[in-house]
């Protein structure tokens, strides 16, 4: 049963993603530029599908398309980061002092929005 669901998710992902690419390559150049948000709804849909999967990504995309009308909002609206997938660990004071003494106390942002976006750009 799990294999069946995984296969359906894979084909739905390919179907929705190919529809977005078709829209970007064929339909979007014909229409005048009128998008109210940055990133555009099609780019938002690609990121939402990549980060959240077929079901949640499609819901985010439908909510975004529902907001994209003359009486709706405008401006910068990025895909929310899936922070629930991160695991946070408590570092004790002794451990942090040890890390500082060894020179390991360097903050490197691997979980921020820019890092995730760069990682996704490398995958596509």
UniProtKB/Swiss-Prot annotation:
This is Putative membrane protein insertion efficiency factor. Belongs to the UPF0161 family. One of its GO terms (cellular component) is plasma membrane. Keywords: Cell inner membrane, Cell membrane, Membrane. The keyword Cell inner membrane applies. It is found in: Cell inner membrane. Pfam families: YidD (PF01809). Could be involved in insertion of integral membrane proteins into the membrane. It comes from Psychrobacter arcticus (strain DSM 17307 / VKM B-2377 / 273-4). It is a peripheral membrane protein. InterPro entries: Membr_insert_effic_factor_YidD. The keyword Cell inner membrane applies. NCBIfam families: membrane protein insertion efficiency factor YidD.
